[in-house]
């Protein structure tokens, strides 16, 4: 019996003393399944660079397209042949301005998101790349045993990949960046799909096969720094594979399922480079939903619902200055918006977009040797030149009209004064004989039956009286009083008067108002750009 016990004890001692070829050990190669997720992640980093680049381009394209349309609409406004067209162009311009104002805060934050994602990805890309390259390079020249297992096996220490091969396989360097929004597989809004290790680099992550030759993964103090144990964990791969001296768990976050409040700050800091990318990635996806679909022109429904449209109607159709005010402005002036703004080529805003597609820009406006379409001009500086040309043309026309109207108004006032003096002169003549003897007076019966000497413009014209010539002009010229109270038919036949809305108005005043609106429009453009 004693012999059996002795043999058993001897066998146990041999089992303990002899080296074992299975199980985890220090100095073993890092298992393939431990480091492969990092290789897959660096392969996916190219998609992050491309998406960040595309977002930047999408933002610029959106803003540029919207601002170009604003300029085109301002050009149409300066060339408008009707009040409705002018109002529609002004309304569409205001709608685009409102859209850009709403996007302004997103432009800054989303450009920052794209830059942040590129910077944080580049940093971690370099950290992971260096870790994998260094571990790959740590292999022997003869049997190729080293620090990374080549395949999915606990007993595979052999390394056949060179650093160059691994760099190509894992895309450890930044590839050609081009705009693309291809979805990433290794990172989502939930986290990093395959980074499931939560203990850092532990002994269970090392392979066996008895080839414990990776000295940098030794737990023996003299083999690592020859000065005691490691003073703090080594943050391999940006902290995901943090290695403590004894290869025990370091307690990292689970990067596969991240929440902003998942861990205490002390734990979170261990893998902060990953968390920075994750936050920037979430911001990127939010921004993509805002800008990737691109700029779209305002719809009829948008224009009908906007107060800015009613302001445009007020300014250009009703011919009143200022913003639309529901409390003071007559709703009747704005009740037909649904008849102006609706789908179809015969309505706005489609008529505006069609007008942009007509080849009718003057050569002088484009400063080229060809007549162009407004839609074909995309450069904002060129559009500004065209706008300036047509704005000056309109100002010159209105300035001329204003001068002529003012001259006519002055002449009309002078004629009115002469006519009044003639009337007073006739009124002073007593008796029909004296009255009728005057070349400009007639003895007429009043409505009450009495007789009175009055000025007779027809008699004055036939007799060639000087005051008659002045009065003849005055009869056809307009003053505010002469236009006041006339109906539409009479107003249209009176020189210097024009029917506006429901009132006969002095055309000189209308020209002045039109000129003022043109100046305001030009100033508005200057403020926008």
Swiss-Prot record:
Top-level taxon of the source organism: Eukaryota
Description of post-translational modifications: N-glycosylated; glycan is composed of 6 to 9 mannose residues.
Record GO biological process: symbiont-mediated evasion of host immune response
Signal peptide positions on this chain: 1-24
Propeptide: 507-529
Tagged with keyword Kinase: no
Main location: membrane
Keywords: Cell membrane, Disulfide bond, Glycoprotein, GPI-anchor, Lipoprotein, Membrane, Signal, Trypanosomiasis
Gene3D superfamilies registered for this protein in UniProt: 3.30.1680.30, 3.30.1680.40, Variant Surface Glycoprotein, subunit A domain 1, Variant Surface Glycoprotein, subunit A, domain 2
Designated name of the protein: Variant surface glycoprotein MITAT 1.6
Protein's organism: Trypanosoma brucei brucei
């Amino acid at each position: 019996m004693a012999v059996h016990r002795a043999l058993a004890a001897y066998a146990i001692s041999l089992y303990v003393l002899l080296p074992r070829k299975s199980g985890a050990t220090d100095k073993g190669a890092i298992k393939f399944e431990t480091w492969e997720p990092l290789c897959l992640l660096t392969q996916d980093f190219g998609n992050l660079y491309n998406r960040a680049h595309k977002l930047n381009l999408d933002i610029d394209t959106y803003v540029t397209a919207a601002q170009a349309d604003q300029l085109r609409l301002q050009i149409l406004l300066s060339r408008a042949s009707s009040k409705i067209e002018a109002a529609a162009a002004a309304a569409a311009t205001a709608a685009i301005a409102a859209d850009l104002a709403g996007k302004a805060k997103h432009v800054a934050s989303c450009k920052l998101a794209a830059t942040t994602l590129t910077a944080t990805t580049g940093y971690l890309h370099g950290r992971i790349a260096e870790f994998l390259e260094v571990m790959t390079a740590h292999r022997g020249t003869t049997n190729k045993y080293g620090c990374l297992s080549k395949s999915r096996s606990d007993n595979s220490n052999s390394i056949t990949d060179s650093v160059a091969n691994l760099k190509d396989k894992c895309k450890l360097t930044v590839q050609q960046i081009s705009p693309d929004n291809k979805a990433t597989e290794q990172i989502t809004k939930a986290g990093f799909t395959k980074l499931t290790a939560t203990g850092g680099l532990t002994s269970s992550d090392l392979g066996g096969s008895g080839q414990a030759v990776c000295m940098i993964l030794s737990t023996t103090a003299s083999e690592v720094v020859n000065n005691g144990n490691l003073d703090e964990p080594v943050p391999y791969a940006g902290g995901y594979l943090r290695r403590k001296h004894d290869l025990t768990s370091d307690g990292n976050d689970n990067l596969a399922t991240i929440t902003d409040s998942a861990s205490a700050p002390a734990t979170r800091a261990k893998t902060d480079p990953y968390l920075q990318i994750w936050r920037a990635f979430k911001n990127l996806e939010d921004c993509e939903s805002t800008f990737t679909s691109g700029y779209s022109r305002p719809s009829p429904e948008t224009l009908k619902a906007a107060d800015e449209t009613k302001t445009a109607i007020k300014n250009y159709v009703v011919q009143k200055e200022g913003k639309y005010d529901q409390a003071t402005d007559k709703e009747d002036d704005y009740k037909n918006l649904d008849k102006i703004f609706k789908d179809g080529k015969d309505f706005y805003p489609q008529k505006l977009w069609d007008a942009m597609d007509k080849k009718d820009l003057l050569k002088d406006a484009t400063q080229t040797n060809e007549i162009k379409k407004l839609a074909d001009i995309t450069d904002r500086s060129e559009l500004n030149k065209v706008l300036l040309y047509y704005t000056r043309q309109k100002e010159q026309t209105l300035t001329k009209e204003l001068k002529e109207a003012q001259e006519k108004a002055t002449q009309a006032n002078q004629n009115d004064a002469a006519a009044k003096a003639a009337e007073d002169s006739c009124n002073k003549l007593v008796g029909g004989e004296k009255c009728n003897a005057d070349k400009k007076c007639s003895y007429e019966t009043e409505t009450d039956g009495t007789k009175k000497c009055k000025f007779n413009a027809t008699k004055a014209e036939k007799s060639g009286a000087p005051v008659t010539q002045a009065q003849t002009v005055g009869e056809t010229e307009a003053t505010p009083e002469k236009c006041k109270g006339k109906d539409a038919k009479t107003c249209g036949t009176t020189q210097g008067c024009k029917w506006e809305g429901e009132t006969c108005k002095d055309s000189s005043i209308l020209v002045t108002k039109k000129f003022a609106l043109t100046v305001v429009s030009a100033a508005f453009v200057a403020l926008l750009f």
